[in-house]
Amino acid sequence: MGRFIFVSFGLLVVFLSLSGTGAALNCASGWSGYDQHCYKVFDKPKSWADAEKFCKKQTSGGHLVSFHSSEETDFVVKLVSQTLESQILWMGLSKVWNQCDWGWSNGAKLKYKAWAEESYCVYFSSTKKGWRSRACRLLGHFVCKSPA
């Protein structure tokens, strides 16, 4: 009986230590999980288009990160701060020219907004809240997001 309790306690410790790391969501090694999605910060700067292509190659359904709540934003900013110092990072929001409207690179409609100003491709800061835009051709670090 004592051995059963010991093993059960050990399994509980392992489960609790893995929760929040992405392991419970079947995220690939090096990716972190939150709300049915997996996230990874990449520290090799790319243009917005190259970063989006890179994310698509990483996992099935992968794209530059899209934000749908302030809680998700807080999770990603914390993840970034653990990996990079003060940086700006691309996210999947850009001007969809054929519709003259903003849209996420994964096709989701823009419902949650946190604009600081408006332009072409959108980035966020690892130290400040709010979104900003700049020319898509400029290089930036980025976060990829995929379904868990």
Curated annotation (Swiss-Prot):
Keywords: Disulfide bond, Hemostasis impairing toxin, Secreted, Signal, Toxin
Classification via InterPro entries: C-type_lectin-like, C-type_lectin-like/link_sf, C-type_lectin/snaclec_domain, C-type_lectin_CS, CTDL_fold
Record's subcellular location: Secreted
Main subcellular location: secreted
Domain of life, per lineage: Eukaryota
Cysteine pairings via disulfide bonds: 27-38, 55-144, 121-136
PROSITE patterns per UniProt: C_TYPE_LECTIN_1 (PS00615), C_TYPE_LECTIN_2 (PS50041)
An annotated GO cellular component: extracellular region
Signal peptide start-end: 1-24
SMART domains: CLECT
Molecular functions per Gene Ontology: toxin activity
C-type lectin domain boundaries: 34-145
Annotated tissue distribution: Expressed by the venom gland.
Function: Interferes with one step of hemostasis (modulation of platelet aggregation, or coagulation cascade, for example).
Family designation: Belongs to the snaclec family.
Oligomer status and interactors: Heterodimer; disulfide-linked.
Other facts noted in the record for this chain: Shows greater sequence similarity to the beta than alpha subunits compared to other heterodimer snaclecs.
Name of protein: Snaclec B3/B5
Source species: Macrovipera lebetinus (Levantine viper)
Lineage: Eukaryota, Metazoa, Chordata, Craniata, Vertebrata
